[in-house]
Every structure is written in C-alpha cells, then in structure tokens.
Amino acid sequence: LFLDELPEFSRESLEVLRQPLEDGQITVSRAAGSATYPSHFQLVAAMNPCKCGYLGHPTRECTCTPSAVDAYRRRISGPLLDRIDLHVEALPVEYDDLASEQGGESSADVRARVIAARALQRERYQALPGVRCNAQLPSSALRRYCRMTPAAEKILRGAFERLGYSARAYDRILRVARTVADLDGSELLDAAHLSEALQYRSLDRKFGMR
C-alpha cells in the first residue's frame, strides 16, 4: 500500500491503519456484530517536510512559518508513526551525483544479499510457528534472537534514556537491527547495526510523539 502525500489523507483514515500495522488483522464492526480479517501488508508512505516542500532544502527557502510546519506535521499522529519501522529522509540529489558515472552497489548485489538474509531468517525461526522473517518475530522472542554486543546495548540504552522511545519502538528497532545484522552476515547485533536502526527513527525526534 503506497500513500503519497501522507498528511493530505484524513486523520480518521490514517488512524484506521494502526490495528493492521500492529496486529496484521483488521476488525470491521457493524450493528449486527463484528468480524476480523487478516490484513498483512507493507505500507510505504511519502510526504514533504512541510507544506511548501522546501524545509531543510540546501538552496531553496522554505516559506512556511514555524506554526505552519508544526500544524502540517501534526496531521500524522505519534501512535501511527510509532508503527512505521523505517523513516528515511530523502535529500535533494546534487547535479554532480546525477552526472557521475560512479555507481554504488548494484541492484543484483542487493538482491543477492536480501535472498541470503531471508533464507537465514527462515532457518533461524523454524521452531517458531508462523514466523518466517524478522518482521514477524514476537516481542517475547526478541531478546533470544536479537543478542547484542555490550557496545550495542549501551547505544540502545542511551538512545532510550535521551529520546524516550516507547516499548513498541524498542521492539521495532531491535527487529530492524536484526535485519541489518543479517544483511551484514552477523549473528550478533553490534554497535553499527544498532546505530543504523536508530537512524531510521529520525521522524520520532522531529515530529515528537503525540
């Protein structure tokens, strides 16, 4: 499910996403009763940093007032943002980068790493019914399968003490760090894996938890 211009959707419509994102199911209630259906899906959402779209732009000036920026961001509730695993800020691409012939990691190489990581996860979770990948790992099993180095534990503890993350964010950070480690071919979660996972929670800090 791709939602472009996320803040332009009604608050009511966005809040309905909270249950399926959390539980993988949706409950429909009517006067005659209610029914629950499976609702596993991948949510991808995009939005501008502000109404005019230029907040933080290196060359264009933002025309929004601070109150307008805050009002725009408040269209996305903290509980919904808390249920989104990855927050990625896309900066404008410089001309030199577009014109450069130097490429990064190829799509084929990335695909090979993802296939290997998914195979590793299927093997790891054979004893857990209904769990085939890190995203499905229940909270009760996180500490068992997401073992951290002391340095990684220190980073995670410091982030929670400074930023006041929720228990839900804790679970999601560990699952993302587990995936980063799998892509890196590491069984232990080290400082680099936790640091990368924490970088993907940047909107929690900018938007605040509402």
Could you tell me what each predicted segment is?
Residues L1-E5:
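Walker B beta-strand of ABC/ABC-like P-loop ATPase nucleotide-binding domains
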Residues L6, R11-R210:
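Basic, amphipathic alpha-helical bundle interface domains used for macromolecular binding and assembly
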